[in-house]
Regions:
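Active-site environment of divalent metal-dependent phosphoester hydrolases
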Residues: 53-55, 94-96, 127-136, 176-179, ...
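Loop/turn elements at helix/coil->beta-strand transitions in domains of secreted/extracellular proteins
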Residues: 20-24, 41-44, 82-85, 118-123, ...
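Surface-exposed beta-strand-to-loop junctions
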Residues: 49, 85-92, 165-173, 275-278
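Generic enzyme active-site microenvironment
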Residues: 48, 89, 126-127, 238, ...
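Binuclear metal-dependent phosphoesterase catalytic core
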Residues: 4-32, 157, 250, 258-288, ...
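Active-site-proximal beta-strand elements of phosphoester/diester hydrolases
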Residues: 42-57, 165-179, 235-245, 307, ...
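Extended active-site neighborhood of metal-dependent phosphoesterases/phosphodiesterases
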Residues: 27-37, 97-234, 250, 254-264, ...
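N-terminal active-site segment of His-dependent metallophosphoesterases
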Residues: 2-105, 110
Length: 388
């Protein structure tokens, strides 16, 4: 029987593998990794998005390779950043709108398995468009069946909670993209109720009437009542779809962001018959990837958020709206969308200061190449043992 050329070689290979796995799973964060110890009273949240898990539909490659690697990435990221809670900003499922209730539960169990020993951390999950579907398939019953398995969400897919004296609010932003449906009206009612709640908690202490349309026409009516809340005195707002980002054109008119000519939306929220080119195509692209301008204005006016966290754009951005409200868009934490996966770490200080670090993970081809090289070296070492 062939022997190893050196008794130390297997140990060297194992040590090299462990060092490689530790390197690939360590996130690279802007400004360096957040300090492991927080000041008294501070809160740190790990913001992830667009995991796009398949649950019971996962392939063997997903179950025995991607889930294993993703679990290592989560474990190392949590050990490095030491968050107090985890927030998923939508699209935890790749095709949740096609799932029945048992398949939806399988997705949640898959995520729990990926978190492993850290599945006991406080967790809040926001619903995204891949979870509930586009406007043509948005169904209140489906949203209710999903939301009842997600602590903190009501039947419309919205939620409000407090953690470490910090108020959070999550909205079913997908419903706000779709006019004329009951789910949208329910989300608007949640907005009015929470706005009333935060006004009552405000420094003025006056009992204000709920915000919203005087005639019940909803967000689009633009007839909200005066809000006495100061900027940033509202909750930390959690969304999947980002807010509309206006910018000045050459004529000085506020309009939608412009994209290169020929941009065509292939987003599931947009029907294929509506895919256009040129200016109309660019507007359609923006409308399918951000909330409408009127909904954005209403949310900012009604809630006066402390800060907004959103996703869906697959990339990181830190944007300040014209009224001074800060919105941070979190990158996708999956290889399925291409590019480099990542997440954000938000640290909430007691004096109202929020610091955000964007952390990036390795691309999938690094992992595939690394494991391939390790297998090649192992095979070469075994082959070498036969030659000696």
């Amino acid at each position: 029987m062939a022997a190893w050329p050196s008794p130390w070689l297997p140990l060297v290979l194992v040590a090299a593998l462990l060092a490689f796995e530790d390197w690939l799973s360590t996130p690279s964060c802007s400004g360096g990794s957040p300090a492991p110890d927080l000041a008294a009273g501070d809160l740190r949240a790990m913001m992830v998005a667009d995991l796009m898990l398949l649950g019971s539909d996962a392939t063997y490659a997903d179950r025995f390779f991607r889930d294993h690697v993703t679990s290592k990435l989560f474990t190392k990221s949590i050990e490095t950043t030491n968050p107090d809670m985890i927030i998923v900003l939508g699209d935890i499922s790749a095709r949740g709108s096609e799932h029945n209730e048992s398949k939806w539960i399988a997705v949640l169990e898959q995520f729990e398995g990926i978190l492993g020993q850290y599945s006991s951390l406080p967790l809040h999950i926001v619903l995204g468009d891949k979870d509930v579907g586009g406007c043509s398939s948005l169904d209140g019953k489906l949203v209710h069946h999903m939301a009842k398995h997600l602590p903190g969400l009501d039947s419309s897919g919205c939620g409000a909670f407090e953690f470490s004296n910090i108020s959070f609010m999550s909205l079913n932003a997908v419903a706000l993209l779709c006019g004329g449906n009951t789910l949208r009206f329910n989300v608007e009612k949640v907005l009015e109720r929470e706005s009333h709640h935060f006004q009552k908690k405000g420094l003025n202490g006056a009992d204000h009437s709920p915000l919203g349309s005087e005639n019940g026409e909803g967000v689009g009516a633009h007839s909200w009542r005066q809000n006495s809340m100061t900027l940033g005195s509202g909750p930390v707002l959690l969304l999947h779809i980002p807010l509309h980002k206006s910018q000045k054109s050459d004529t000085g008119v506020i309009g939608v962001p412009m994209f290169p000519d020929g941009t065509v939306s292939d987003h599931p929220l947009v029907p294929p018959s509506s895919k256009l080119r040129g200016v109309d195509g660019r507007r359609l692209y923006d409308q399918s990837h951000t909330l409408p301008a009127n909904s954005t204005q209403y949310i900012l006016q009604a809630l006066k958020p402390r800060i907004i966290f959103s996703a869906h754009a697959d990339s990181f951005s830190d944007h300040t709206h014209p009224d001074g409200t800060r919105e941070v868009t979190v990158p996708a934490m999956t290889w399925k969308k291409g590019g480099m996966p990542g997440f954000a770490i938000a640290t909430f200080g007691q004096k109202g200061v929020v610091s955000v670090n964007c952390c990036w993970l390795v691309q999938e081809w690094y992992i595939m190449t690394g494991y391939s090289v390790f297998l090649f070296l192992t095979a070469l070492a075994i082959r070498w043992s036969h030659w000696i």
